[in-house]
Amino acid sequence: MEEFKDAQKTEELLNEINEDIRKELSEERYKHSVGVMKKAEELAKIYRVNISEAKLVGLAHDIAKEMPKEAKFKYVEEKNIKIDEIEKINIGLLHGKIGADICKKRYDFSTDMQKAIEYHTTGNPNMNMLAKIIFVADKTEEGRSYSNAERQKELEELRQISTIDIDKAVQIAIDESIVYTIQKGGLIHPDGIATRNKLLSEKFVTM
């Protein structure tokens, strides 16, 4: 699919996605998706990424988030989507891959747009700027907040950093996610670690 440049086409597709997620997601998740769309638009303007693509992916990124567990397993099996051992245990991670496949079939999303949806759950060393924007927008959209004062402070700092250095924002978001996952006794996906290490390695090389 060609880059989204036609404003009317973009609005029509945004309306279609909006109608779909209204039906398929809870009100809270729907509001989050709209928030991610707005934050993705903001970051796309800063980093000179196709704004239409950022908005479309931001709105659609969680389209498979609330699919029942059994349905997720059935979907990846029927569509022959490869999943790893951690994804088999932590079913929540599958909504990225499933969402990417849904958006390819329903909305004819480009490969880059699909990858941005797939990678938003764990990160990926091969993320391009669109994927990084969606990853960070998911963590920093204005509707997100924490009752814990320290976590809220970290969120505000991440929002500020995201407008200056998107790579640093991705790395910090992954760091915080790893710490939180360890505290909860959860499994850490290797893609997150690989992404963090790549970003840090690039930073050290340029120092």
Features from the language model and the residues they span:
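Charged phosphate-binding loop/patch that engages nucleotide di/tri-phosphates or the phosphate backbone
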Residues: E176-M207
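Generic N-terminal amphipathic, Lys/Arg-enriched alpha-helix
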Residues: M1-K5, K9-L25
